[in-house]
C-alpha cells in the first residue's frame, strides 16, 4: 500500500468485531469469493450493469448469502445498507492494473476510476484484498496482526530505554553547561524514531479493532509525555523558541525518510545549529517543566527574562522573585528543584 495513513478509516470500518468484517470472514470461510463496493457515488452507479436492486439493511448474514451469486455487491459508503446484488461492473478497460484474476482486475479498475473502497475476496487463495483509489492492501489475519503489534511493542520498549538514557545524559550536560549540537541532535532523532514506531503500532491497533485495547494501553504508557518533551527540546535549542516553529520543525522531520533521519548533521542544521561539536545552551523549557507545580506561564516568563537555563541556575532569590508570577516561596521552590535535579543526575552519573 502506498500510503497506509489513507487506509486508517477503512481499516476501522473493517476491524475485527465489526459487522462488515464478520460478513467478509464468513465469505472467506465458505470459499465463495466476492466483489464488494463500499460506496454509492454516481461514479460507482454508472459502472453497474444488470443485477437487482435491494436497498435493504446490511447484516453479515445477508452479505454472506448474496455473495453466493457471481455478481458484485454494492453497499452504501457507511456499509449500513445493501443497494445492489449480483451486479456486473464495467470499469474503463484502459485503466492499468497489475492484477491477473478477473475479479481482482475489475476491483482495482473500479477503485482507480471511482476512488471508492472495493473489496475483492479470493475464492482460492483465502485472501481479502482492499482497493481504494491507487492503493492496495491485503487484510491480514487477526493473529498475524497481533503478533506484529507485540513485536513492535517490544522494539518500542527497547528503543525508549535507549532514548531515555540519551535524554538523561542531555539533562546532566545542560546543568553543567556542556551541551554540544551532537547531544541535542541525537535526542531529537531518537525521539522522532520512537514516535514513528508508535505510529506503526497505532495502525496495528486500528486493524485489531476492539481486540487492540491492551496494545493501545501499553502504547499509551510507553509514549506518555514523549511527544510533548520532544517539542520542549526543540524549543530549547531551535533558532527561535516559538511553539509553532517547533511544531513546524517536528512536522518537517516527520516527512523525512529513514535514511535522512540518520544524518545527525542534518538534524542539527534543522534546529539552526552549526557543526556537531559546536556548543549549545538550553533555554530551559524542558528542565523547568520538571519542577513540580510550576505553571507553564511562569516558565515562559522565566525564559523571557533570563534567556538561558544557566542564567536561571545562577539567579538569586531576589532576581527570581522579580519575575512576574514568582513570589519568594516559588523562587525558593525553583532553586530547590534545580538543586535536586543537579544532585540526582550527578548521582546517576556515578552509578
Swiss-Prot record:
Q: What is its EC number?
A: 2.7.7.85
**Alphabetical UniProt keywords:** ATP-binding, DNA damage, DNA repair, DNA-binding, Magnesium, Nucleotide-binding, Nucleotidyltransferase, Transferase
InterPro entries xref list: DisA, DisA_sf, DNA_integrity_DisA_N_sf, DNA_integrity_scan_DisA_link, DNA_integrity_scan_DisA_N, DNA_integrity_scanning_protein, HhH_motif, RuvA_2-like
Name the reaction it catalyses: 2 ATP = 3',3'-c-di-AMP + 2 diphosphate
Q: Name one GO molecular function term.
A: hydrolase activity
Q: Which Gene3D superfamilies does this one have?
A: 5' to 3' exonuclease, C-terminal subdomain, DNA integrity scanning linker region, DNA integrity scanning protein, DisA, N-terminal domain
Identify which cofactors the protein needs according to its UniProt entry. Mg(2+)
Q: Tell me the Gene Ontology biological-process terms attached to this UniProt entry.
A: DNA repair
Q: Which Pfam families match?
A: DAC (PF02457), DisA-linker (PF10635), HHH (PF00633)
Domain called DAC: residue spans: 4-142
Residues bound to ATP:
71, 89, 102-106
The record, for SUPFAM superfamilies, names: RuvA domain 2-like, YojJ-like
- Subunit description: Homooctamer.
**HAMAP family registered for this protein in UniProt:** DisA
* Function text: Participates in a DNA-damage check-point that is active prior to asymmetric division when DNA is damaged. DisA forms globular foci that rapidly scan along the chromosomes during sporulation, searching for lesions. When a lesion is present, DisA pauses at the lesion site. This triggers a cellular response that culminates in a temporary block in sporulation initiation.
What the record says about family reads: Belongs to the DisA family.
Q: Which PANTHER family does this one have? A: DIADENYLATE CYCLASE, DNA INTEGRITY SCANNING PROTEIN DISA
Name listed for the protein in its UniProt record: DNA integrity scanning protein DisA
Q: Which organism is it from?
A: Symbiobacterium thermophilum (strain DSM 24528 / JCM 14929 / IAM 14863 / T)
* Gene that produces this protein: disA
Amino acid at each position: 500500500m502506498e500510503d497506509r495513513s489513507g487506509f486508517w478509516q477503512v481499516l476501522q470500518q473493517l476491524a475485527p468485531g465489526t459487522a462488515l468484517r464478520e460478513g467478509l470472514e464468513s465469505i472467506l470461510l465458505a470459499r465463495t469469493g466476492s466483489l464488494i463496493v463500499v460506496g454509492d457515488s454516481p461514479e460507482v452507479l454508472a459502472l453497474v450493469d444488470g443485477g437487482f436492486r435491494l436497498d435493504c439493511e446490511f447484516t453479515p448474514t445477508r452479505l454472506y448469502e448474496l455473495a453466493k451469486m457471481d455478481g458484485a455487491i454494492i453497499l452504501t459508503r457507511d456499509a449500513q445498507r445493501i443497494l445492489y446484488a449480483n451486479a456486473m461492473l464495467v470499469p474503463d478497460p484502459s485503466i492499468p492494473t497489475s492484477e491477473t484474476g478477473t475479479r481482482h482486475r475489475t476491483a482495482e479498475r473500479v477503485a482507480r476510476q471511482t476512488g471508492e473502497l472495493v473489496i475483492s475476496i479470493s475464492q482460492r487463495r483465502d485472501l481479502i484484498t482492499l482497493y481504494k483509489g491507487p492503493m492496495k492492501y491485503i487484510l491480514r489475519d487477526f493473529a498475524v496482526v497481533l503478533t506484529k503489534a507485540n513485536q513492535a511493542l517490544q522494539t518500542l520498549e527497547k528503543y525508549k530505554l535507549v532514548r531515555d538514557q540519551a535524554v538523561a545524559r542531555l539533562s546532566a550536560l545542560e546543568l553543567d553547561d556542556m551541551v554540544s549540537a551532537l547531544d541535542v541532535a541525537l535526542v531529537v532523532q531518537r525521539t522522532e524514531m520512537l514516535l514513528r514506531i508508535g505510529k506503526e503500532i497505532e495502525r496495528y491497533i486500528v486493524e485489531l479493532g476492539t481486540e487492540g485495547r491492551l496494545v493501545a494501553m501499553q502504547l499509551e504508557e510507553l509514549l506518555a509525555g514523549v511527544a510533548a518533551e520532544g517539542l520542549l527540546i526543540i524549543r530549547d535549542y531551535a533558532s527561535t523558541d516559538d511553539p509553532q516553529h517547533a511544531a513546524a520543525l517536528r512536522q518537517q522531520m516527520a516527512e523525512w525518510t529513514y535514511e535522512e533521519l540518520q544524518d545527525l548533521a542534518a538534524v542539527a542544521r534543522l534546529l539552526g545549529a552549526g557543526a556537531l561539536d559546536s556548543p549549545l545552551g538550553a533555554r530551559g523549557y524542558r528542565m523547568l517543566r520538571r519542577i513540580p507545580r510550576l505553571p507553564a506561564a511562569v516558565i515562559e516568563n522565566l525564559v523571557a527574562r533570563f534567556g538561558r537555563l544557566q542564567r536561571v541556575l545562577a539567579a538569586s532569590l531576589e532576581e527570581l522573585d522579580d519575575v512576574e508570577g514568582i513570589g519568594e516561596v516559588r523562587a525558593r521552590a525553583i532553586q530547590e528543584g534545580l538543586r535536586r535535579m543537579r544532585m540526582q543526575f550527578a548521582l546517576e552519573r556515578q552509578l
